């Protein structure tokens, strides 16, 4: 896979239910290794670099509050299966400080 090409990859989620696309992970490690968060400007650079559109889903807005609380308390999102919008593919499913999220991308 080319360094500036982001394409669907095999998803093998961890025991906690997390997964990160290897090309996305490499880019973030090389460009934002010591950052606590990604600024809007840096996110736009990422999207431009790969020529993609992205969408982020937050688990709290997609599951009932009881399920959300159980999954967050257990640090286990294996039961959460967000569905990619048409033409999008998963690049990251993980935890933030306050929620879990799934990031999807599609090539422009």
Regions found by a protein language model. Give the residues of each.
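N-terminal "domain-start" segment
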Residues: 1-65, 69-78
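Short, compact, well-ordered microdomains
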Residues: 74-108
């Amino acid at each position: 896979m080319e360094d500036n090409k982001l394409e669907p990859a095999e998803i093998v989620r961890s025991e906690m239910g997390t997964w990160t696309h290897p090309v996305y992970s490499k880019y973030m490690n090389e460009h934002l290794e010591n950052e606590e968060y990604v600024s809007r400007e840096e996110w736009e650079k990422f999207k431009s670099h790969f020529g993609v559109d992205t969408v982020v889903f937050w688990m709290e807005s997609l599951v009932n509050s009881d399920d959300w609380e159980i999954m967050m308390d257990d640090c286990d999102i294996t039961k959460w299966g967000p569905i990619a919008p048409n033409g999008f593919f998963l690049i990251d499913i993980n935890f933030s400080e306050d929620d879990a999220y799934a990031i999807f991308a599609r090539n422009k």
